[in-house]
C-alpha cells in the first residue's frame, strides 16, 4: 500500500460535486498495472463509503415517523379563515394542502443561500440547507427524474435550479383567489326585489274585476289567458273614456251658449236637440256635487221654516229637487223637461197670472244676457211683499253693491245676504212695487260674468 494524501483531502469535495471519475496515474510498468488498479478501486470504494456516511443524499429521504413529527413541529398548521361554505368543502383535504405555498425568501435567506453556494463550491453544504432542500422536495410537485438531476448539480447550475424551483412571488397587482363574498342585508333585499321584478315582468296582466287565480298544482294544467276578453275590456274602457271626454266637451259648449246668448236662443237649442239638455244637466250636477253645500238645500231649509201654504215659483227648476224637498205648492219652470211637474217655457215669459205667488226662486239660473227680463217677470208674478230668493256662483259678481242697487231699481229691497260661502252667494229681496225705471234704462249692475268651466 502507498500513501496518497491528495486523494484523501479531495475526497469530500468530490463527494459533494458528484460521482467521481477515476483516472489513475500512468503505470510505471505493465507488471504492476493490475495491482495498482485493484488498489485504486479499493481506495475509491472506501472514499465513496466515507462520503455517503458523512453526507447522506437527499434522494434517500424516507418518510419515517420521526421525520414526520419533526416536520410537523417545525411547520405548524396554518388555520384557514375561509367562509363556512369553503370550510365544509375543504374538510376532506389533507393537512399539507391546507398549508399555503412556501413563502418567498427574504433578504436574509438570499444572503444565506449565497454563503451556502460558496460553501458548496468549496466543499459541502450545511445541515440547514439539507433540511430546507428536504422540505422543498416534499412540497414542490417535481418529478423524480428532475429531482435527481438537480441534487447532483452544484455551482451556478444548482443555484439557478433552486431559484427556479422556488414558488414565484405574488405581484401586488395580481389577483389571488379570495373567499366568497357574503352579501349584506341591503344587497340581499335588492337581489330579492330584482328577482320579483323579473318574475312579474313575464306574467300576464290581470283584469281588475276578476279575483287572482290560485296557483296551479302539478296535476292541473295552466290555461292560457284569453286575449279576446282582455282586448275587449281595454277597448270598452277606451270607448268609455273617449265618450266621457266627448260629453265634457259638449257640456262646455252648451254652457257657453247658455251664458253668451238670450234665453230664447237657448230654448230653441234644446227644442231642436232634446238630448242636449239631459247631457247639460248631467254635467251640471257632476260639478255641483263637489261643493260642500248645495244652494238648493239651503233654500229648502229656509222655506221649511215658513208656512206650508205659501205658493212658490221655481225659475230653472232642473230635476224639481226643491219641489221634492218642501211641502209648499211649487210651480216648476225650465227650458226642457226632466220631470212631469216641469213646465217647459222661457223664464222671461212664464204662464202665471200677476201677483199669484208668494216666493220666487232663482237657484243658479240667472243665465243668459237678459237677466233683467227674468227679474221683471218675477216682480210681475209676485204678490206685494212677496219674497225673491237668488243664489248664484260667487265668481260671477265683480261688485256685489252694484248688483244690489240694480235689483232695488226693479221694485225690490234687500232683506238679507250671505257672502260666507266660498262657492255661491245667497240674497233675499222683498217686493216693494213695480220697477222704478223704464224698459229702456240700462242697469250695468245686472251684467254678471259667465260661469265657464275649464277643460280638465
From Swiss-Prot:
Residues 143-153, 161-176 have a biased composition (Polar residues). It is found in: Nucleus, Nucleolus. Keywords: Chromatin regulator, Methyltransferase, Nucleus, Phosphoprotein, Repressor, rRNA processing, S-adenosyl-L-methionine, Transcription, Transcription regulation, Transferase. SUPFAM superfamilies: S-adenosyl-L-methionine-dependent methyltransferases. InterPro entries: RRP8 (IPR007823), RRP8_N (IPR042036), SAM-dependent_MTases_sf (IPR029063), UbiE/COQ5_MeTrFase_CS (IPR023576). CDD domains: AdoMet_MTases (cd02440). S-adenosyl-L-methionine binds at residues 281, 316, 334, 346-347, 363. Component of the eNoSC complex, composed of SIRT1, SUV39H1 and RRP8. Essential component of the eNoSC (energy-dependent nucleolar silencing) complex, a complex that mediates silencing of rDNA in response to intracellular energy status and acts by recruiting histone-modifying enzymes. The eNoSC complex is able to sense the energy status of cell: upon glucose starvation, elevation of NAD(+)/NADP(+) ratio activates SIRT1, leading to histone H3 deacetylation followed by dimethylation of H3 at 'Lys-9' (H3K9me2) by SUV39H1 and the formation of silent chromatin in the rDNA locus. In the complex, RRP8 binds to H3K9me2 and probably acts as a methyltransferase. Belongs to the methyltransferase superfamily. RRP8 family. This is Ribosomal RNA-processing protein 8. The gene is RRP8.
